[in-house]
Amino acid sequence: MHEAQIRVAIAGAGGRMGRQLIQAAMAMEGVQLGAALEREGSSLLGSDAGELAGVGKSGVTVQSSLEAVKDDFDVFIDFTRPEGTLTHLAFCRQHGKGMVIGTTGFDDAGKQAIREASQEIAIVFAANFSVGVNVMLKLLEKAAKVMGDYSDIEIIEAHHRHKVDAPSGTALAMGEAIAGALDKDLKDCAVYSREGYTGERVAGTIGFATVRAGDIVGEHTAMFADIGERVEITHKASSRMTFANGALRSALWLKTKKNGLFDMRDVLGLDVL
């Protein structure tokens, strides 16, 4: 048994991502699984979290009450849905718990609530916790500065049939990285759908295309297309474990932070590159 530097609680323990997070927490050096949460009324309540995730007994029982486990964790990891995450955010803010938030689909009010909470607690909030995706975001900034003013920029993303928001949070983060490098606001230049007679492509826009099919874990491509050539920067995920490991790495990184809003690029130190 390794010595724990940080104790984590996992939201949505019975979901696809929740189970991966439990596996990662039980395997990662310096991390202790302190609590696992599911919604009230779930048939999984009372289960052993490790057995639920297929990695053996953990001694942590799946519960529905954050109040009941508030003394069992330091950082709360949440990859659920916006409404649930905001409820958890209020609890963590009240009790001084750090958060790692991988939930996507927040509206402006939800994002503002996260910003306000970060004045009191430490939060890592990222659209994607993969190391590769965050390296890609840095590459996109550099490509945009060189090619963005004369290229047609399109972002194509594909996910499994069960994903409920579109475009993905990662695709939006890609768009924001590109727009920011061009001194633009993504809200002013994004094109999210094309149908019927659209006319010619408007220069300076960033287009988005979405695929939902099968069990695709996550694929993202940014295209910089000019006459005669194009550059494509692509990331493909083959396992959710890459996201889970990134989230646990973020939780460890938060142990020295009292408050503030960070993203995965802060965790990886990419902003110094």
Curated annotation (Swiss-Prot):
GO terms classed as biological process: diaminopimelate biosynthetic process; lysine biosynthetic process via diaminopimelate
Entry EC number(s): 1.17.1.8
Active site: H159, K163
Molecular functions per Gene Ontology: 4-hydroxy-tetrahydrodipicolinate reductase; NAD binding; NADP binding; oxidoreductase activity, acting on CH or CH2 groups, NAD or NADP as acceptor
Primary localization: cytoplasm
UniProt cross-references to SUPFAM superfamilies, sorted A to Z: Glyceraldehyde-3-phosphate dehydrogenase-like, C-terminal domain, NAD(P)-binding Rossmann-fold domains
GO annotations of cellular component type: cytosol
Source organism superkingdom: Bacteria
Binding residues annotated for NAD(+), in chain numbering: G12, A13, G14, G15, R16, M17, E38, G102, T103, T104, A126, A127, N128, F129
Entry binding sites for (S)-2,3,4,5-tetrahydrodipicolinate: H160, G169, T170
Keyword Nucleotide-binding: no
Subcellular location: Cytoplasm
SUBUNIT field: Homotetramer.
Protein name: 4-hydroxy-tetrahydrodipicolinate reductase
Organism ancestry: Bacteria, Pseudomonadati, Pseudomonadota, Gammaproteobacteria, Enterobacterales
